[in-house]
From Swiss-Prot:
<dbReference type="InterPro" id="IPR012281">
    <property type="entry name" value="Phospholipid_synth_PlsX-like"/>
</dbReference>
<dbReference type="GO" id="GO:0006633">
    <property type="term" value="P:fatty acid biosynthetic process"/>
</dbReference>
<comment type="function">
    <text>Catalyzes the reversible formation of acyl-phosphate (acyl-PO(4)) from acyl-[acyl-carrier-protein] (acyl-ACP). This enzyme utilizes acyl-ACP as fatty acyl donor, but not acyl-CoA.</text>
</comment>
<comment type="subunit">
    <text>Homodimer. Probably interacts with PlsY.</text>
</comment>
<keyword id="KW-0594">Phospholipid biosynthesis</keyword>
<keyword id="KW-1208">Phospholipid metabolism</keyword>
<keyword id="KW-0443">Lipid metabolism</keyword>
<keyword id="KW-0444">Lipid biosynthesis</keyword>
<dbReference type="Pfam" id="PF02504">
    <property type="entry name" value="FA_synthesis"/>
</dbReference>
<comment type="pathway">
    <text>Lipid metabolism; phospholipid metabolism.</text>
</comment>
<dbReference type="GO" id="GO:0043811">
    <property type="term" value="F:phosphate:acyl-[acyl carrier protein] acyltransferase activity"/>
</dbReference>
<dbReference type="InterPro" id="IPR003664">
    <property type="entry name" value="FA_synthesis"/>
</dbReference>
<keyword id="KW-0808">Transferase</keyword>
<keyword id="KW-0963">Cytoplasm</keyword>
<comment type="similarity">
    <text>Belongs to the PlsX family.</text>
</comment>
<protein>
    <recommendedName>
        <fullName>Phosphate acyltransferase</fullName>
        <ecNumber>2.3.1.274</ecNumber>
    </recommendedName>
</protein>
<dbReference type="GO" id="GO:0008654">
    <property type="term" value="P:phospholipid biosynthetic process"/>
</dbReference>
Length: 347
């Protein structure tokens, strides 16, 4: 197995990316890592080059670059060369902690969509505080600002395969993020999406879910549009950090007794922080393209990079992309007919 790594992408690149690759090698002895970036800078942090190949390039897509322009103009950047390697069959997957928009564009324009799928979705794994499973998957969390009901249905299919193949959940419970649990809640798109999900016998659809219930283990896969999903994701992250900060400040401002109590609760706080750390699950996955595309947080450290690379290995090993491609190929005619029927309804 070969994983193409954008060694220059991210706030802490290349140091934390290279160190993360070094850690991942210990867990993944069957993987060859192809690092794209400035060879002399990569060499500073690589103790040895066992199972590692470096492809030198001086060009880098920065966080400030406009995504589509960067993909078109920076042909020799570390991210684009890594994506081209996947397209050409020289690597099985791509990993980057760099510019999210540019990676999405590279996934769409270079690696390409699975035939029969209208729009890919960005998928992330979040912790469940209670329920049958420790985590749940949510998509879309940023690939599409606007979505049609059909897209939300497709996201449910993508999430169902991800839950089954990668998360190893049997018959994942799928819920639609909405402003109420009743079937008739939401706008026209969500009402239509509800019916599509309800009528798809291949999905274990459990109905609508409100955002306040997301972490309570109600569903294994939560479906939403990219704008809402991204806002919810950042809200969860921000709320968790703010609450921990508030508790810490309250303890420190309550004198000796408060500090002693905080010391006694230190282990409990560490457990809570560990449970809420979704970076342990790896990165966000662009589902619906012809090869695994995994995006880690820009501020990822070496351990988080390692976790994401282990996740990439799991995705490739599970043959998730092939299973998705086979599904949409098998249902291509019915998808085309649904599109024709929808167009006739609108005329």
């Amino acid at each position: 197995m070969k994983i193409a790594v954008d060694a220059m992408g991210g706030d802490n690149a290349p140091e934390e990316i290279v160190k993360g690759v070094s850690e991942a090698r210990k867990a993944l002895p069957d993987v060859e890592f192809i690092l794209y970036g400035k060879k002399d800078e990569i060499a500073k942090y690589m103790d040895d080059f066992r199972n590692v190949k470096v492809v030198h390039t001086d060009e880098v897509i920065t966080m400030e670059d406009e995504p589509v322009k960067a993909v078109r103009r920076k042909k020799n950047s570390s991210m684009i060369l890594a994506a081209q390697a996947v397209k050409n069959g020289d690597a099985d997957a791509i990993f980057s902690a760099g510019n999210t928009g540019a990676l999405l564009a590279a996934g769409l324009f270079i690696i390409g969509r699975i035939k029969g799928l209208d729009r890919p979705g960005m998928t992330t794994t979040l912790p469940s505080l209670k329920g049958e499973n420790d985590n749940f998957t949510m998509l879309d969390v940023g690939a599409n600002a606007e979505s049609k009901a059909k897209n939300l249905h497709d996201f449910a299919i993508l999430g169902n395969f991800y839950g089954t193949n990668v998360m190893h959940v049997t018959n994942p419970r799928i819920a639609l993020l909405n402003n109420g649990t009743e079937y008739d809640k939401g706008d026209k798109i969500h009402k239509e999406a509800y019916q599509l999900l309800k009528n798809d016998s291949s999905l274990n659809f459990v109905g609508n879910i409100e955002s306040r219930e997301l972490l309570n283990g109600t569903a294994d896969v939560v479906v939403t549009d990219g704008f809402t999903g991204n806002a919810v994701l950042k809200n969860i992250e921000g709320t968790a950090l703010s609450m921990l900060k508030l508790v810490k400040e309250t303890i420190m401002n309550n004198g000796v007794k408060g500090k002693m109590g905080g010391l006694l609760l230190k282990s409990a706080f560490s457990q809570i922080k560990d449970q809420m750390d979704y970076s342990k699950q790896g990165g966000a996955v662009l589902l619906g393209v012809k090869a695994p595309v995994v995006k880690a947080h820009g501020s990822s450290n070496a351990n988080q990079v390692k976790n994401a690379l282990v996740q990439v290995h799991e995705i490739v090993d599970s043959k998730l992309v092939k299973n998705l491609a086979d599904y949409f190929e098998m249902h291509l005619e019915s998808i085309k007919q649904d599109d024709v029927d929808k167009e006739n309804e609108n005329n």
